[in-house]
């Protein structure tokens, strides 16, 4: 099942970006021109569809083709200035935007922890290199392994098992930035508690632009 905003046939002269967010039960896809959403959809995946794959990595071709079909159905050519995918379970890093390369794709594909978000950077990188007019850069932003925890937030009760930072960083930080804009403040100047309530649930304490404590949303 696909839920659409109004499609279009032209991208115009501003920078165009394809956004891909693979989740446990859906793949969200959007095209932005500048800061304006041109077409946004959620492609739902039934249990029956996903059960044909032995592991999440096997869904890569299936989900990539769904994105290509979505572009075709909405008369949008594969010709973007950038493609950005949801960041997966890579090594712990600071928040921000990162350019995808083959090494990142390999690390994500071979990640010890498995989740559909691992497909985000891989599909973005593959589509970026499939563009008929030449490859464009692929990126991820604020992956689920963003780690800016305070030292005391890592204490678990055993020094052998420190608490890990695996959370919905992209959505939480986006909502925090939106809230800050709505009240006329800077995210970096605020102390906030932000909760993500979806297929998974994470709650994080944001202190001056950094999530200094959060529950582990995967393990």
Question: Can you annotate each of these PLM segments?
Answer:
Residues 4-14, 115-129, 150-153, 167-192:
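Conserved phosphate-binding catalytic cores of ATP/NTP-utilizing and phosphoryl-transfer enzymes
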Residues 13-58:
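Short glycine-rich, Thr/Ser-proximal phosphate-binding strand/loop in the N-terminal lobe
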Residues 15-20, 80-84, 192-196:
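Short glycine-aspartate micro-motif
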Residues 24, 58-62, 66, 118-122, ...:
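Conserved active-site and cofactor/substrate-binding residues in soluble primary-metabolism enzymes
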Residues 32-37, 96-107, 131-134, 154-159, ...:
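A glycine- and small-aliphatic-rich helix-loop capping segment at beta-alpha/alpha-beta transitions
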Residues 39-78, 102, 108-113:
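N-terminal phosphate-binding loop and adjacent alpha-helix
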Residues 71-116, 137, 145-157:
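Short beta-strand-loop/turn "lid" adjacent to the catalytic site in phosphate-handling enzymes
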